[in-house]
């Protein structure tokens, strides 16, 4: 299949943006209502219920919710663990609108978190911003992965970045191009891709920030910024 097939039309991009708008509204709702004692499963169920209420056709993948050290597993399956004050909450979610997927991850603090955790968060934040800035049409996907990976390594956390930098999003949640170190894929104008660096320290902490961008624009599709949010109840 030709690479150009994975560049998105104006209509396809509009569906992706509409889906992200729903996800943004769900995220706003969660930030406004989350309370200590809710379980990961309960929060996942609430998120998916709100997605449908706000107009989603369905979820684009099983929603990930991880509290505290559980977030050190990138594809954690929500459990009965309850939310405690002073830990991170990681949410990875997306919906389908018009047959097009969306994909979005944020990590926020529920109460005050440790200084080291904030440091890790801000490294991921800065590295993601660099990745978005450096994403250009007609570059190799692996070149973007190297930029992101090298920056995390330079900051002392390279061994804790244990997945790829990103992937294409469209009719499939994971599609061409794949932004990883062994990729031969090309980034072309109007492709929709994720930039999603993370740092995962087993048994301690996990942070991921993920946004979809349109190649050639260097802008997040989501309205949400990435400065650390601290929710206090």
Segments (PLM) and residue ranges:
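Active-site neighborhoods and metal-handling regions in enzymes and metal-associated proteins
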Residues: 1-233
